[in-house]
Amino acid sequence: MRAQRGLILLLLLLAVFCSTAVSLTCYHCFQPVVSSCNMNSTCSPDQDSCLYAVAGMQVYQRCWKQSDCHGEIIMDQLEETKLKFRCCQFNLCNKSDGSLGKTPLLGTSVLVAILNLCFLSHL
């Protein structure tokens, strides 16, 4: 019984140390939309996600706290009044890939295709 407790304690300690030893790496740039970001930084332990945000013609890429990944908080921190953003939690996931704002367009296209199929099947 004592050996099991010791093993469990050891596994818990290893889990804690392993999770804190590995830091997230994010792209870190503030630039116009047309530029591409090649700089990256290792996030501090309290920053557990990467942020990619676009406000007008400006792009923000940096480490961020997942718990602060809300539009109002991001706008306040970046001093912007309107933006599109995404947060992600794996290394260099905040690359500028042009995907912001395209999901609704894809959803609309799929919806139109489904509606067309429904109407065509009733003719």
Swiss-Prot record:
What InterPro entries does its record include?
Answer: CD59 (IPR056949), LY6_UPA_recep-like (IPR016054), Snake_toxin-like_sf (IPR045860)
Q: List the disulfide bonds.
A: C26-C50, C29-C37, C43-C63, C69-C87, C88-C93
Please describe the organ and tissue distribution of this protein's expression.
Expressed in all tissues examined (liver, kidney, spleen, thymus, brain and heart). Low levels in thymus. Also expressed in mononuclear cells, erythrocytes and platelets. Barely detected in neutrophils.
Q: What's the chief localization of this chain?
A: membrane
Q: Which UniProt keywords apply?
A: Cell membrane, Disulfide bond, Glycoprotein, GPI-anchor, Lipoprotein, Membrane, Secreted, Signal
Q: Name one GO biological process term.
A: negative regulation of angiogenesis
Q: How does it assemble?
A: Interacts with T-cell surface antigen CD2.
Tell me, in a sentence or two, what this protein's role is.
Potent inhibitor of the complement membrane attack complex (MAC) action, which protects self-cells from damage during complement activation. Acts by binding to the beta-haipins of C8 (C8A and C8B) components of the assembling MAC, forming an intermolecular beta-sheet that prevents incorporation of the multiple copies of C9 required for complete formation of the osmolytic pore.
Q: What is this protein called?
A: CD59A glycoprotein
Q: Which organism is it from?
A: Mus musculus
Q: Which gene encodes it?
A: Cd59a
